[in-house]
């Protein structure tokens, strides 16, 4: 059943406990990074995330900073990851805990009421195909992070493969893939043929500081990155990028300009981070 929706964007995703380069636990998951993209929104915007109540204290600073923009729902567990950056383009990642699943009950609890949704799965099981179909039936335009296609739901060193359900694709309006995810999905070079086979109207393939390819209606356009930021760890850059893209699309901005604005936001936010070694790419 279609719901009465307002122009705007809602981000849905699991909270995550991150351990980056052996440092103490830090807030992770899209909810921890996307809010900076939504704070100056001219359209309705909010984030709904899930995590175990025992872990909510780690995310209190986010609630204090962003207030009503962020809402946290209780779940039986919290996603957890370890990330070790090797250099600006490479990192090792492992899964310490698989997070909760967003089903019908969780969608009803979140009750998104905006035309656009940014779904931010950390692993393949976060948003099942039935959930995506339910959201599409409500009338939402879904922007989906490709992590949910390639990341297997198992504890240990992160396993990525292309064994995802094809039923995940039809409900999507936009699919965002990092370069390495695109290679996995395509089983080789990602090109117009791959984009046509997937059947998603808009596909973004990001290349970090090298920019972003936009696949729409059988064509591809490369949008350069705003500027390069070296010497920082870039966890969450993809979350900020996709949230900003979805926000601007919900406001009527076209794909190319939305990518430009998202790239500018990410570069500006990365410049605020302390320089350190080793560094990596999100």
Residue ranges and their predicted role:
Residues 2-8, 16-25, 40-121, 125, ...:
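Conserved N-terminal subdomain of the carbohydrate kinase-like
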Residues 2-5, 159, 163-166, 189-282:
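Conserved phosphate-binding/catalytic region of the ribokinase-like
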Residues 13-15, 240:
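Active-site metal-binding loops of divalent metal-dependent hydrolases
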Residues 26-30:
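Conserved alpha-helical elements of sugar-nucleotide-dependent glycosyltransferases
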Residues 36, 81-83, 211-215:
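Short beta-strand scaffold segments in enzyme catalytic cores
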Residues 48-50, 145, 206:
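Generic beta-sheet signal
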Residues 116, 120-193, 211:
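Conserved beta-alpha-beta core of the PfkB/ribokinase-like small-molecule kinase fold
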């Amino acid at each position: 059943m279609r719901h009465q929706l307002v122009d705007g964007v809602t981000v849905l995703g699991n909270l995550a406990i991150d351990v980056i380069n052996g440092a103490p636990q830090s807030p992770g998951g899209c909810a921890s990074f996307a809010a900076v993209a939504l704070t100056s929104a001219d359209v309705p915007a909010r984030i709904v995330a899930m995590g175990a109540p025992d872990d909510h204290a780690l995310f209190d600073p986010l609630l204090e900073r962003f207030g009503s923009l962020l809402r946290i729902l209780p779940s039986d567990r919290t996603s957890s990851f370890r990330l070790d950056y090797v250099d600006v383009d490479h990192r090792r990642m492992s899964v310490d805990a698989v997070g909760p699943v967003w089903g019908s009950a969780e969608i009803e609890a979140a009750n998104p009421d905006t035309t656009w949704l940014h779904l931010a799965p950390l692993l393949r099981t976060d948003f099942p195909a039935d959930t995506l179909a339910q959201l599409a039936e409500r009338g939402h335009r879904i922007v989906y992070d490709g992590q949910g296609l390639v990341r297997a739901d198992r504890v240990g060193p992160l396993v990525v493969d292309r064994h995802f359900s094809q039923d995940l694709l039809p409900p999507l309006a936009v699919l965002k893939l990092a370069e390495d995810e695109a290679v996995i999905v395509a089983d080789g070079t990602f090109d117009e043929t791959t984009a046509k086979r997937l059947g998603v109207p808009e596909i973004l393939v990001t290349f970090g500081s090298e920019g972003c390819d936009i696949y729409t209606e059988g064509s591809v356009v490369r949008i350069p990155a705003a500027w390069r930021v070296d010497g920082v760890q870039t966890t969450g850059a993809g979350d900020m990028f996709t949230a900003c893209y979805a926000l601007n699309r919900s406001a009527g901005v076209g794909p190319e300009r939305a990518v430009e604005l998202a790239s500018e936001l990410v570069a500006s936010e990365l410049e605020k981070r302390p320089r350190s070694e080793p560094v990596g790419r999100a």
